[in-house]
């Protein structure tokens, strides 16, 4: 009997994946791993090397040259994890506006994604990790001990996204946010589905603390989960 050592969190856009992942990892003493940081690390390396973010061949070659690692925080400066590229701490450097501008372009190529997934899987194999991102339960960690797929109503997700934007001094009409999320949902319906054995968690009306408590009590520490070897 054991507590899940690998936890995969996927779900709809703005459903609260990162919030749940970070709080759950903190409660368990696990690594919180937002897989998007891998692509940010690659984008930073491309900027430094002068590589065009639209050049798939060059980006793929660069991705294979990089060793990207994500660990528990090594510095008490507010970070949730430490990101290393070939041994260099780039945790804050990958958050620059320059990286932000090109990361989605660098991440869209299949050959790049395959290499990033390979490196994500290496981190997942260590265990004691809560991994958050797209296709985590189906592609990156299909054998994860616990898979959670988050869903919430469009209205709830729009409200949360609006609050997040306001915290960054960005004011956007709720209707515009909802329309953008609906468009994203339509795109995701063709490319991103929950794993067959994922727990579908609808979190409308739940605070982050309530959601973490629910997951811990019902799916992590429950008698049934332990009896199943999870």
UniProtKB/Swiss-Prot annotation:
Its EC number is 2.7.4.25. It catalyses: CMP + ATP = CDP + ADP; dCMP + ATP = dCDP + ADP. Keywords: ATP-binding, Cytoplasm, Kinase, Nucleotide-binding, Transferase. It is found in: Cytoplasm. Transmembrane segments: none annotated. InterPro entries: Cytidylate_kin, Cytidylate_kinase_dom, P-loop_NTPase. GO terms for molecular function: ATP binding; CMP kinase activity; dCMP kinase activity. GO terms for cellular component: cytoplasm. ATP binds at residues 11-19. It holds the Pfam family Cytidylate_kin. The keyword Acetylation does not apply. GO terms for biological process: pyrimidine nucleotide metabolic process. Gene3D superfamilies: P-loop containing nucleotide triphosphate hydrolases (3.40.50.300). Belongs to the cytidylate kinase family. Type 1 subfamily. This is Cytidylate kinase. It comes from Chloroflexus aggregans (strain MD-66 / DSM 9485).
């Amino acid at each position: 009997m054991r507590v899940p050592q690998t936890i995969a969190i996927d779900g709809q856009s703005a459903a609260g994946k990162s919030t749940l992942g970070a709080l759950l990892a903190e409660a368990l003493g696990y690594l919180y791993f937002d897989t998007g940081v891998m692509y940010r690390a690659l984008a930073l390396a491309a900027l430094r090397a002068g590589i065009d973010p639209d050049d798939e061949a060059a980006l793929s070659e660069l991705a294979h040259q990089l060793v990207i690692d994500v660990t528990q925080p090594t510095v008490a400066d507010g970070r949730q994890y430490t990101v290393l590229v070939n041994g260099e701490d780039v945790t804050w450097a990958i958050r620059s506006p320059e990286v932000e501008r090109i990361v989605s372009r660098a991440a869209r190529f299949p050959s790049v994604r395959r290499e990033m997934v390979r490196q994500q899987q290496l981190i997942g194999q260590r265990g004691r990790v809560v991994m958050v991102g797209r296709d985590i339960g189906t592609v990156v960690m299909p054998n994860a001990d616990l898979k959670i797929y988050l869903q919430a109503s469009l209205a709830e997700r729009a409200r949360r996204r609006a609050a997040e934007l306001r915290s960054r001094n960005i004011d956007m009409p709720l209707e515009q946010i909802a329309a953008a999320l609906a468009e994203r949902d339509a795109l995701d319906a063709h490319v991103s589905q929950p794993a067959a054995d994922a727990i579908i968690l609808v979190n409308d009306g739940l605070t982050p603390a309530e959601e973490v408590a629910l997951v811990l009590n019902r799916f992590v520490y429950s008698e049934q989960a332990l009896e199943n070897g999870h």
